[in-house]
UniProtKB/Swiss-Prot annotation:
One of the proteins required for the normal export of preproteins out of the cell cytoplasm. It is a molecular chaperone that binds to a subset of precursor proteins, maintaining them in a translocation-competent state. It also specifically binds to its receptor SecA. Its main location: cytoplasm. This is Protein-export protein SecB. The keyword DNA damage does not apply. One of its GO terms (cellular component) is cytoplasm. GO terms for biological process: protein folding; protein tetramerization; protein transport. The keyword Chaperone applies. Belongs to the SecB family. GO terms for molecular function: unfolded protein binding. SUPFAM superfamilies: SecB-like. It is found in: Cytoplasm.
Length: 161
């Protein structure tokens, strides 16, 4: 009985069990010619997150970043990093858990992914690339709104069919 009371008093729990690089890639398809041109890049960042339950209260979250730099029409470099983490999360409501997996965990992983990308770009002898911080809370809120809007539209479409 005392154990149950202790567990209830502990409340929400969040532990990082492991942070690791799941996949990494760096390509310079137009080298060495790209190094001989004036450097005026257009940099595009794509990011995605996904999570899966490994066991009770243990989740893997993967943050995927793809950075593409084009110099004119040519791709200067393409860098992809999948930064992952294993998180033990307990004592949260379903909504809180979704927020943790969709925003908080990616926020923990982002500095690792940013450092990996910066290192790869530097090793490719390109000028330093500093990725700006990402507001994962805002991205998650936008995702939730889109899902709610899609759910609201679905019954209307069924009624019209």
């Amino acid at each position: 009985m005392a154990e149950v009371a202790n567990n209830e008093q502990q409340g929400p729990q969040f532990n990082i069990q492991r942070v690791y690089t799941k996949d990494i890639s760096f390509e310079t398809p137009n080298s060495p010619a790209v190094f001989q041109k004036e450097w005026n890049p257009e940099v595009k960042l794509d990011l995605d997150t996904r999570s899966n339950k490994l066991s009770d209260d243990v989740y893997e979250v993967v943050l995927s970043l793809t950075v593409t730099a084009k110099n004119g029409e040519e791709t200067a470099f393409l860098c992809e990093v999948q930064q992952a983490g294993i998180f033990a999360i307990a004592g949260l409501t379903e909504q809180q858990l979704a927020h943790s997996l969709g925003a908080y965990c990616p926020n923990v992983l982002f500095p690792y992914a940013r450092e990996a990308i910066g290192s790869l770009v530097s090793r490719g002898t390109f000028p330093q690339l500093n990725l700006a911080p990402v507001n994962f809370d805002a991205l998650f809120a936008q995702y939730v709104q889109q899902r709610q809007a899609a759910a609201a539209d679905a019954p209307a479409e069924e009624a019209n069919a």
